[in-house]
C-alpha cells in the first residue's frame, strides 16, 4: 500500500463544498464533552479549507457504538458548540447525515458555512451491520449501503478524510464517497508521512519496542517488524511467555499465553535468520498481588518468580540494558507498555523507556508512538510534544505496522 496520497494542500478549494470525515468520537459525560482533544486536532484542516475560500465545510463523524439506530446519548449535537468554540465560528448542526433535508441544506449554502452532521452510525449502512433496539442483529444490503454513500457524496464537491483512527474500517463514510478528488487532511497526512518514514525508508538502526499482554495478539506485528527492524525489544506481559519458552524460567503467576507460546521458537529462529537482535528482560519487579499496595521484590531469570507472585514491570538491570538499545537507534516505533504503568509502583520501566525515547528524539532519532496504551503514557507523562509522532489511531496504527492495507487510505486519491 502506497502511503503517499493527495493532500488537502494539493487541491483547489475555492468555491467548493468540502466534505470532511473527522473523528469526533470524544468522551462524554451527562451530555457534555469531557475531552476536546480530537476536536482540536481537526481544527487546522477545517480552518485551512475556509481560509482557502471553500464555499462550505460539511463535517461528518461517528460517536460511540449506537449499532445502526438512533440512540440519544450518542448524538453529536452537544459536540457542535465545542467545534464552534474552537473554530471561532458558528457551526450549524443538522439532525441527520443523509436524506433530502440534509442534501437541501448543503446544496447551495451561504459562503463560509460550516455544518456538522448527526452521528453516521445512527444508520446501519455506515458500518454495514448493527443491532436493533430490541437486540436482534441487523444488516444493510449492498444497495442500501450504495444509496447511503451516494447521499453523503451529494453533500460536497471535494472529499477530505482526517479520521486516521477509523482508517482500518471499510465503512461507508471512509470508502464510499465517490467524488473526483479524495484527499487526506493534515492529521491523516501527518500519520501517513511518519509511518511511511518508518516502514518504507527508515534511518537505521531501526528499533521496535513491543509490549502488551499477549504474544498471540501481536504475532502479525512481530512477524512484520522482523522483516524491517535491526533490533526488537520485547517487554510487558508477553515477555514472560518468551522467557518461559526460551529459558524454561519459572514465572509464578505471571501472564502466560499458551497459544502464543507455540510460536516463540519460530520467532527466535526468524530473528536469527534475518539478523535481528531480540532483547528480553533480565530482571523483574514482582508482586504478591495485582494491586498498588502489593509487596514487591526484584527477581531474575535465574531465580525465577515465586509461586503466587507475578511480574508486573521490568527491573533495574533491564532498564539499563534497554536504555542502551534505545539510545543507539535512529528510528523507533513503540507499541505497548513495559509494565502495568497504570499503577505507580509498576510504572518505572515504562517511564524509563519513555525518558530514553525522548532523549533519542532530542538526538535526532525519528520516534513514533503507536496509539492505545503507549499514547496514554505520553499523555500521562506529558511527552506528546517530546517525541516525533504520537499516533491518534490505536487499531489503525497497529494494522499499518502489521503490514495490512487500510481501506480508508486505499480509498484516497494517490499523490501525483
From Swiss-Prot:
Name of the top EC class for this enzyme: transferase
GO terms of molecular function: ADP binding; ATP binding; metal ion binding; phosphoglycerate kinase activity
Binding residues for ATP: 213, 218, 237, 311, 342, 373-374
One CC-aspect GO term: cytosol
Catalyzed reactions per annotation: (2R)-3-phosphoglycerate + ATP = (2R)-3-phospho-glyceroyl phosphate + ADP
Superkingdom per UniProt: Eukaryota
Residues that bind Mg(2+): 213, 217, 373
Pathway: Carbohydrate degradation; glycolysis; pyruvate from D-glyceraldehyde 3-phosphate: step 2/5
GO BP field: gluconeogenesis; glycolytic process
Tissue specificity annotation: Expressed in all cells of the worm (at protein level), higher expression in the cells associated with the tubercles (tegumental modifications), the muscle and along the tegument.
Record-listed (2R)-3-phosphoglycerate binding positions: 22-25, 37-38, 61-62, 64-65, 120-121, 168-169
Gene3D superfamilies registered for this protein in UniProt: Phosphoglycerate kinase, N-terminal domain (3.40.50.1260)
Binding site for CDP: 212, 217, 236, 336, 341
InterPro entries: Phosphoglycerate_kinase (IPR001576), Phosphoglycerate_kinase_CS (IPR015911), Phosphoglycerate_kinase_N (IPR015824), Phosphoglycerate_kinase_sf (IPR036043)
PROSITE patterns linked: PGLYCERATE_KINASE
Keywords attached to this entry: ATP-binding, Glycolysis, Kinase, Magnesium, Metal-binding, Nucleotide-binding, Transferase
Cofactor(s) in the UniProt record: Mg(2+)
EC assignment: 2.7.2.3
Pfam families per record: PGK
Binding positions for AMP per the UniProt entry: 213-214, 218, 237, 311, 342
Chain sites annotated for binding ADP: 212, 236, 341
Function: Involved in the seventh step in glycolysis. Catalyzes the conversion of 1,3-bisphosphoglycerate ((2R)-3-phospho-glyceroyl phosphate) to 3-phosphoglycerate ((2R)-3-phosphoglycerate) and results in the formation of ATP. Associated with the tegument to provide the energy needed for the tegumental repair resulting from immune damage.
Record note on quaternary structure: Monomer.
PANTHER family referenced in this protein's UniProt entry, alphabetically: PHOSPHOGLYCERATE KINASE (PTHR11406:SF0)
Protein name per Swiss-Prot or TrEMBL: Phosphoglycerate kinase
The organism of origin for this protein: Schistosoma mansoni
Amino acid at each position: 500500500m502506497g502511503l503517499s496520497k493527495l493532500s488537502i494542500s494539493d487541491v483547489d478549494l475555492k468555491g467548493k463544498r468540502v466534505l470532511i470525515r473527522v473523528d469526533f468520537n470524544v468522551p462524554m459525560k451527562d451530555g457534555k464533552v469531557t475531552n476536546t482533544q480530537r476536536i482540536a486536532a481537526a481544527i487546522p484542516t477545517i480552518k485551512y479549507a475556509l481560509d482557502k475560500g471553500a464555499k462550505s465545510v460539511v463535517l461528518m463523524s461517528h460517536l460511540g457504538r449506537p449499532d445502526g439506530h438512533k440512540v440519544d446519548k450518542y448524538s453529536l449535537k452537544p459536540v457542535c458548540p465545542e467545534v464552534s468554540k474552537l473554530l471561532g465560528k458558528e457551526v450549524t448542526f443538522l439532525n441527520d447525515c443523509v436524506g433530502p433535508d440534509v442534501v437541501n441544506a448543503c446544496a447551495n449554502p451561504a459562503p463560509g458555512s460550516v455544518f456538522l452532521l448527526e452521528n453516521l452510525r445512527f444508520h446501519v449502512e455506515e458500518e454495514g451491520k448493527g443491532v436493533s433496539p430490541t437486540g436482534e442483529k441487523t444488516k444493510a444490503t449492498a444497495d442500501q449501503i450504495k444509496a447511503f454513500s451516494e447521499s453523503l457524496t451529494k453533500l460536497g464537491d471535494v472529499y477530505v478524510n482526517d479520521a486516521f483512527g477509523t482508517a482500518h474500517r471499510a465503512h461507508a463514510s471512509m470508502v464510499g464517497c465517490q467524488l473526483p478528488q479524495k484527499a487526506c487532511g493534515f492529521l491523516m497526512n501527518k500519520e501517513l508521512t511518519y509511518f511511511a518514514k518508518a516502514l518504507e525508508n527508515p534511518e537505521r538502526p531501526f528499533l521496535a519496542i513491543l509490549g502488551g499482554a499477549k504474544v498471540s495478539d501481536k504475532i502479525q506485528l512481530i512477524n512484520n517488524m522482523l522483516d524491517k527492524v535491526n533490533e526488537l525489544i520485547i517487554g510487558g506481559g508477553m515477555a514472560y511467555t518468551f522467557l518461559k519458552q526460551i529459558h524454561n524460567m519459572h514465572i509464578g503467576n505471571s501472564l502466560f499465553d499458551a497459544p502464543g507460546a507455540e510460536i516463540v521458537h519460530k520467532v527466535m529462529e526468524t530473528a536469527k535468520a534475518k539478523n535481528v537482535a531480540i532483547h528480553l528482560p533480565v530482571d523483574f519487579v514482582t508482586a504478591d498481588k495485582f494491586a498498588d499496595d502489593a509487596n514487591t521484590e526484584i527477581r531474575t531469570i535465574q531465580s525465577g518468580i515465586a509461586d503466587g507472585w507475578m511480574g508486573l514491570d521490568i527491573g533495574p538491570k533491564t532498564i539499563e540494558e534497554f536504555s542502551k538499545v534505545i539510545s543507539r537507534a535512529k528510528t523507533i516505533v513503540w507499541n505497548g507498555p513495559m509494565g502495568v504503568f497504570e499503577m505507580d509502583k509498576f510504572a518505572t520501566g515504562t517511564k524509563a523507556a519513555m525518558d530514553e525515547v525522548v532523549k533519542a528524539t532530542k538526538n535526532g532519532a525519528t520516534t513514533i508512538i503507536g496509539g492505545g496504551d503507549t499514547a496514554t503514557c505520553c499523555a500521562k507523562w506529558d511527552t506528546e510534544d517530546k517525541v516525533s509522532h504520537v499516533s491518534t489511531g490505536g487499531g489503525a496504527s497497529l494494522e499499518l505496522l502489521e503490514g495490512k492495507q487500510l481501506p480508508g487510505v486505499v480509498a484516497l486519491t494517490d499523490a501525483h
